Amino acid sequence: MERLVKTLTFKIGEETRPVKLNKDSYKDNLLSAQISKALGLIEEFFPSDKTTIRDDLDDIPANKTISFLGDRGTGKSSCLKSLVNILTEKRKDICLLETIEPAFFDKHRNIMELIIGTMFGKYEDWLDEQQDANRHNLLVELGYAFQEVKRDLQYIESECCQEDSELEDLQGLASSIGLSASVKKLVDAFLIVEKKDYMLITIDDIDLNASLAFEMAEQIRKYLIIDKVVVCIAGKSEQLSDAIRQSYIRLYELLLEQDRKSTRLNS
């Protein structure tokens, strides 16, 4: 039986740095299995052959999130960077946004704002370019889509907070639903200007910001489950699970405290 040989290459001084493989070099790398599986999933979600008639559309999951999970130094970031690099070479129909770093995510800047901000940066670059009448009109429509998302984003920060009234609670719910629709509309308008069919969003080290990891995961689930979008994340599953567990504990303790206050008022 022929043995499959994988190459492990070390560069002095760069042993712990992520590597960025291309469409040829990744095949003989130790990370080839993980990268190949991710490429296969993206091909399954978004076939490169547009002439293929698919009869399995109902089997394509709505939640198209791909995760590279493992301990520190196991190659998660390398997989993420290599995947983007390979898709840049192979798939001209996919819009590849700059990788989001949760280090910039805090109580004043959530994950959705970072993603929208990355898209808006490209939008500003397009505005500086020469454009014909048709492209100008497309950029105007895209600008309106950004404004709509920005209005809905204003309510996200208070989503998990206790509302002062049932009316405010309903307003928050309506804004949450509205944001999901406005983000989808923004992605569609963005892809038209970019002249791409699909979008790939990559988020590295999602578990590093442990105190806000649960909120990041929830916002991805709520607002980025979009037909034309694949989200790729890298992180340590145990640390992410622990962060989510702690968030549920804090929420449960808050509910218990509210219940105790309500009991005292009614007694």
Predicted region positions:
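Conserved small/polar residues in nucleotide/adenosyl-binding loops
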Residues: K261-S267
